Swiss-Prot record:
Protein name (database record): Peptidyl-tRNA hydrolase
EC number annotated for this UniProt entry: 3.1.1.29
Domain of life per record: Bacteria
Biological source species: Paraburkholderia phytofirmans (strain DSM 17436 / LMG 22146 / PsJN)
Function according to Swiss-Prot or TrEMBL: Hydrolyzes ribosome-free peptidyl-tRNAs (with 1 or more amino acids incorporated), which drop off the ribosome during protein synthesis, or as a result of ribosome stalling. Catalyzes the release of premature peptidyl moieties from peptidyl-tRNA molecules trapped in stalled 50S ribosomal subunits, and thus maintains levels of free tRNAs and 50S ribosomes.
Subcellular location: Cytoplasm
One protein family per Pfam: Pept_tRNA_hydro
Enzyme class: hydrolase
């Protein structure tokens, strides 16, 4: 069963619409669905709410520590409520998936994502669930003829808002993620994965 759902992003109005904040977008939607408001909770270093979703009590969290220190916030909630790593779902932006794609997985490396890297370090475990929201990679914007030797600026890319057509398909992928939340929260993660991965 999933007891804690974390959305990753950076705090501050200047980052709200950026690709790196896709995890926040999903958790914001969940809070709206639950009719609750995330509030600044100092002891958890983030915006936090206890919500009732699909008949279960779930903790929602958006770390306000900046991305590369997200683990500090996640571990604070996990320790306080005695939540195990495999009862945690982290929603985050994923460079290795195209916009419009969304995938669910348990464990694995960080794929260069500093938020995941810090969460893994703080939990001393990779065995937490990830909901990977595709944002595409800046190399995909470089014409193939010019790709050899080109160094895409990943840091700049994730801190910029998606183009309109990308935003539309990212929003649609988040809706698909929300559609499988009943299974995810109840612990039917294999079923959720099959349903989610039937779509691109």
């Amino acid at each position: 069963m999933i007891k804690l759902i974390v959305g990753l992003g950076n705090p501050g109005a200047e980052y709200t619409a950026t690709r790196h904040n896709a995890g926040f977008w999903l958790v914001d939607q969940l809070a709206r669905e639950a009719g609750t408001t995330l509030r600044d909770e100092r002891r958890f270093h983030g915006f936090y709410a206890k919500a009732r979703l699909h008949g279960e009590e779930v903790h929602l969290l958006e770390p306000q520590t900046y991305m590369n220190r997200s683990g500090q916030s996640v571990v604070a909630v996990a320790q306080f409520f005695k939540i195990l790593p495999d009862e945690i779902l982290v929603a985050h932006d994923e460079l290795d998936l195209p916009p419009g794609s969304i995938k669910l997985k348990l464990g694995g490396g960080s794929g260069g994502h500093n938020g995941l890297k810090d969460i893994t370090a703080h939990l001393s475990s990779q065995q937490y669930w990830r909901l990977r929201i595709g944002i595409g990679h800046p190399r995909d914007l470089i014409p193939e003829s010019a790709r050899a030797g080109a160094k895409p600026d990943v840091a700049n890319y994730v801190l910029k808002p998606p183009r309109r057509e990308e935003q539309d398909v990212i929003d649609a992928s988040i809706e698909r993620g929300l559609a499988v939340m009943p299974q995810i929260i109840k612990g039917e993660l294999e079923r959720a994965m099959m349903q989610l991965h039937r779509n691109p």
